[in-house]
Amino acid sequence: MFHIALYEPEIAPNTGNIIRLIANNGCQLHLIEPLGFDLEDKKLRRAGLDYADLANVSHHKNFESFLKAMQGKRIMACTTKGSRPHSELTFQQDDVLLFGPESRGLPADIIDSIPTEQRLRIPMMSTSRSLNLSNAVAIISYEAWRQLDYSGT
């Protein structure tokens, strides 16, 4: 299956929703520290309901340790600054979908380190800034899973 990575997530309920999501689609979640909340946060647990035991979650102390763990995998920067719509990419089994923090998105240096053709965006109205993080993760991860014929079901 593929991987979902959250770079310095800030809002516990969003991460909780994503934990519930990955329990349902079989992805592995990577949380890249620092986190903007405590993992024991009530809002995180409430949003994730009882899915935490079904979810595969890894923690990384920083971006460098995350990159080391993902060595050899294709990383997609999921950003409003993406060069192409997410639906134009042909996803592969071990791809990594990397999302930035809610208030600021991925830093420019991280975006710049990823090949242009691997910088994905979700099409939206020109008057909008962004989508909610957990919604964006759902949209892109389910498109990737669809392309992989819902493997694992």
Swiss-Prot record:
Keywords: Cytoplasm, Methyltransferase, S-adenosyl-L-methionine, Transferase, tRNA processing. One of its GO terms (molecular function) is tRNA (cytidine(34)-2'-O)-methyltransferase activity. The keyword RNA-binding does not apply. Pfam families: SpoU_methylase (PF00588). InterPro entries: Alpha/beta_knot_MTases, SpoU_MeTrfase, TrmL, tRNA_m1G_MTases_N. It comes from the Bacteria. It catalyses: cytidine(34) in tRNA + S-adenosyl-L-methionine = 2'-O-methylcytidine(34) in tRNA + S-adenosyl-L-homocysteine + H(+); 5-carboxymethylaminomethyluridine(34) in tRNA(Leu) + S-adenosyl-L-methionine = 5-carboxymethylaminomethyl-2'-O-methyluridine(34) in tRNA(Leu) + S-adenosyl-L-homocysteine + H(+). One of its GO terms (biological process) is wobble position cytosine ribose methylation. The keyword Transferase applies. It is found in: Cytoplasm. Its EC number is 2.1.1.207. GO terms for cellular component: cytoplasm. S-adenosyl-L-methionine binds at residues 100, 122, 130. Homodimer. Belongs to the class IV-like SAM-binding methyltransferase superfamily. RNA methyltransferase TrmH family. TrmL subfamily. Methylates the ribose at the nucleotide 34 wobble position in the two leucyl isoacceptors tRNA(Leu)(CmAA) and tRNA(Leu)(cmnm5UmAA). Catalyzes the methyl transfer from S-adenosyl-L-methionine to the 2'-OH of the wobble nucleotide. This is tRNA (cytidine(34)-2'-O)-methyltransferase. It comes from Shewanella piezotolerans (strain WP3 / JCM 13877).
